[in-house]
Amino acid sequence: MNSIKDCTGREGGTRPDPIAIINKYYEPGSFAHDYIIRHGKMVAEKALEIAERVFWLPPGSMFIEEAAMLHDIGIFMTNAPHLGCTGDYPYIAHGYLGRQILEDEGYPLHAYVCERHVGVGLTAAEIKEKGLPVPCRDMLPITPEEEIICFADKFFPVGPDNMLTMRSIEEARAEIGGYGVRHLRKFDRWAIMFREVSGVKE
């Protein structure tokens, strides 16, 4: 199988089959299985739309589609009954848990997307300051693909009542603002860079 390189030239293993991986950890036909596939497809579609607008980067579209489908793979390990998940970890932990899963599966670059998509990414300083129940290390999106998927994810609410809806950029800004000023400023920079600028002051 072909090895993967992202925009920075990092090597990252072989190409995954996202549905096969999801089926390994989620019971087909369960609400959690349905949710993670629907949400992943919507984030992937939005991320690919963004990628087409930023051809100068240039992001890898196949990698974006795969990683977007798998970015929430760790939610089954969290206590999120509204998503059909009855694990022991708090929901915020699903990012680094997803990284562990995909690293074990042999997909380290896709694994980074899992860990780095919470909010606009978490810094070690804010993890320590806020006492967040995740490892104390920087979990920030670095590559264009990681940033695009993280940004695209912010347009889709978490939960059964509105999982098929897409937020406006104003609604996404209001949601991300709850994480703090740094997150909102980063989101706004991405909105400009990715040409999604309605409602954002340049």
Give the location of each predicted region.
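Amphipathic alpha-helical segments within well-ordered protein domains
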Residues: 23, 44, 48, 98-103, ...
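Generic structural signal for well-ordered, non-transmembrane alpha-helical segments
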Residues: 41, 108, 192-195
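Divalent metal-dependent catalytic cores for phosphoryl transfer on phosphate-bearing substrates
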Residues: 56-169
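Charged phosphate-binding loop/patch that engages nucleotide di/tri-phosphates or the phosphate backbone
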Residues: 175-202
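A short, gly/pro- and small-residue-rich
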Residues: 169-175
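Acidic/His-rich, divalent-metal-binding segments that scaffold phosphate/diphosphate chemistry
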Residues: 1-91
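Alpha-helical scaffold segments in carbohydrate-active enzymes
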Residues: 46-49, 154, 193
